[in-house]
């Protein structure tokens, strides 16, 4: 059985995320995930949410064995070509340890819809968002 750890980054400090990653690796966890969100829907203010890909790249430099990935990356937030390049780069930086979790993002009914609005993107219907995931997979 493989066991992974999810680090919830909402209002987290990098040094705490780093310590958790090192502890997870020392404890024998197989993988480590962090959310790829732009904001904490439950916080009106605070330090914000660390950007997932930047954190994962930094964690790749301090860990040696544990797999790393975003859980899950909303394909609407990045062009699939940019995402493919990001994934290839992180795969190289980690020495093959990238776990790529991708998804369609939340519907208009979720608090995460505000992330697309902040980027100037509309929150599309479920079937359109699902199709965009398939398109991103095909491109990658």
Tell me what each language-model feature is.
Residues 1-62:
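N-terminal beta1-alpha1-beta2 module of alpha/beta enzyme domains
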Residues 36, 70-72, 102-106:
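Glycine-rich, histidine-containing beta strand-loop boundary motifs that form or position
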Residues 63-71:
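Conserved catalytic cysteine-centered active-site region
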Residues 61-64, 95:
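Residues at helix-coil transition
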Residues 40-41, 75-77:
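Short, small-residue-enriched loops and turns at beta-alpha junctions
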Residues 2-12, 77-140:
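Flexible, glycine-rich active-site loops centered on histidine and acidic residues
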Residues 33, 67, 99-101:
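Conserved beta-strand positions in the central sheet of alpha/beta enzyme cores
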């Amino acid at each position: 059985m493989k066991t992974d750890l999810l680090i919830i980054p909402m209002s987290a400090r990098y040094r705490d995320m780093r310590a958790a990653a090192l502890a997870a690796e020392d404890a024998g966890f197989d993988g480590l995930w962090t959310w790829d969100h732009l904001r904490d829907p439950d916080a009106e203010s605070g330090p914000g949410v660390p950007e997932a890909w930047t954190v994962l790249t930094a964690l790749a430099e301090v860990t040696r064995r544990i797999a790393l990935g975003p859980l899950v990356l909303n394909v609407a937030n990045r062009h699939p070509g940019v995402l493919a390049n990001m994934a290839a780069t992180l795969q190289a930086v980690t020495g093959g340890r990238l776990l790529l979790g991708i998804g369609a993002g939340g519907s208009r009914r979720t608090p995460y819809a505000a992330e697309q609005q902040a980027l100037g993107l509309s929150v599309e219907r479920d079937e359109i968002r699902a199709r965009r995931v398939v398109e991103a997979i095909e491109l990658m």
